[in-house]
Curated annotation (Swiss-Prot):
A zinc finger (AN1-type) spans 7-55, 95-145. Zn(2+) 4 binds at C118, C121, H135, C137. The gene is SAP16. Zn(2+) 2 binds at C28, C31, H45, C47. The keyword Amino-acid biosynthesis does not apply. Zn(2+) 1 binds at C13, C18, C36, H39. A zinc finger (C2H2-type) spans 224-247, 261-284. Zn(2+) 3 binds at C101, C106, C126, H129. Induction: By cold, dehydration and salt stress. One of its GO terms (cellular component) is cytoplasm. The keyword Lipid biosynthesis does not apply. InterPro entries: AN1-like_Znf, Znf_AN1, Znf_C2H2_type. This is Zinc finger AN1 and C2H2 domain-containing stress-associated protein 16.
Length: 290
């Protein structure tokens, strides 16, 4: 068996009448014997263990599921076990019913290659009705409103009307009425605040106008006022005469009053303190002590 280069090449067939050497032998997965190409099947070499791993699957007519029959078990027992535990008749429609195009009058079966999903209505159609006008597409869904508070009020009002008609829904009626009451009170308080602000502004403007008119009526024609006293005069000449009589003497007396600094050593008088300091430093050696 084999050659000098490959002494273990090839094996003899296990069938007694054959015993043929095969360089590519087959090993049976049931009896683990080696056979040639002619006797590789179970029936050709009459394998005694052929039925041990036999696989038989039956399709259930109720649920369209596969039921595997066990080799060492009665098929009736296996079938009863499936019917009492795993059988689901609702699965039959899912498996056997083929998906078709939803357009009325179209009987096209939808498969992997001819199915198109519409972006607007998100439904699957065949290639013939893939465009919106062909399958009467309703268009994209409208976006929700950007005012959730208003929608909440409308929903609460609808809920309240429904609760009035149906006395059993007392809980939803209470929540909707509470929300509506809160919104109404918030609106009324805002309106009251705006009304108060408008009233206060009007009163302030009226008071300012009244003050201006009162001051002008009290002063009459006295438009010239003295800068040194609160006296008022009708003409500039009267104001000048008042200043000369009442405030001229005070200005002259203030001018006649002159501060004099006296040297403590020589009793020399100086009007400017700087001159006194220079005199002391120059004539008395920088000291003012006697």
């Amino acid at each position: 068996m084999g050659t000098p280069e490959f002494p273990n090449l090839g094996k003899h067939c296990s069938v007694g009448d054959c015993n043929q050497i095969d360089f590519l032998p087959f090993t049976c997965d049931r009896c683990d014997h080696v056979f040639c190409l002619q006797h590789r099947s179970y029936t050709s070499h009459q394998c005694p263990n052929a039925n041990q791993k036999d696989v038989t699957v039956l399709i259930c007519p109720l649920c369209a599921k596969g039921v595997r029959l066990n080799p060492n078990e009665d098929p009736n027992i296996t079938w009863d076990t499936h019917v009492n535990s795993d059988c689901d008749p609702s699965n039959y429609q899912k498996v056997t019913k083929k998906k078709k195009c939803p357009v009325p009058g179209c009987r096209e079966t939808l498969t992997f290659s001819n199915t198109i999903r519409c972006k607007d209505c998100t439904k699957e159609h065949c290639l013939k009705h893939r465009f919106g006008p062909d399958h009467k597409c309703p268009g994209p869904r409208k976006p929700e409103s950007t005012f959730p508070f208003g929608n909440m009020l409308r929903r609460s009002q609808k809920a309240e009307s429904c609760s009035n008609s149906n006395s059993s829904s007392t809980s939803s009626s209470w929540w909707s009425s509470s929300l509506l009451t809160a919104a109404t009170s918030f609106k009324s308080s805002a309106e009251a605040g705006m009304q108060k602000l408008s009233t206060a502004t009007t009163q302030a403007i009226q008071k300012a106008k009244d003050g201006i008119s009162t001051s002008s009526s009290n002063s009459g024609d006295l438009v010239e006022q003295c800068v040194q006293c609160p006296a008022r005069f009708s003409t500039v000449g009267a104001l000048i005469e008042h200043c000369e009589k009442s405030h001229q003497s005070n200005s002259q007396s203030s001018r006649s009053r002159v501060t004099v600094d006296v040297c403590p050593k020589c009793s020399k008088a100086f009007r400017d303190p700087v001159l006194l300091v220079e005199h002391v430093e120059r004539d008395h050696g920088g000291t003012s002590r006697a």
